[in-house]
């Protein structure tokens, strides 16, 4: 299944300061498309196109693979003419231990499983890492611990870095910095580890 949207803008008319009529052609066209290829694969993209120069102005293309719960990986390409050109890798994946959802009758016991989640952007123009988030999550069944590092570029040679630590008592409360929100905002398809045990489900399509 897929969708395609095309949004042209209106033609504008005006008068120059010396009284001469002027007609501005159509401004950029915005195209957007998304496709759910099968149960595991998604793809989407947007393109801003200038009909006067017959060149793209901005574009984003992304493909995502999600074979199961708490398993997602995506790659993206971002382009802004004369400004930036980036590639991006984002993920959420189990790395060690038995997930709570696989323990059957013992799913309420406090065992442990480790997950990694994050997003890394690389500038093809500057040949360096730009914005990035990397984190680890430990799901003990009755509580979840999140640890992460967020790095934001504020200039070609300047960055801001912060460390996040959060403890979630499943079904009760969360303590510490909001690492959950940062991961949810940065990782396409990210799913909260306790979503099947909490009153609210946090799934990002």
Description of each model-found segment:
Residues 1-205:
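Long, low-hydrophobicity, solvent-exposed regions enriched in small/turn-prone and acidic residues
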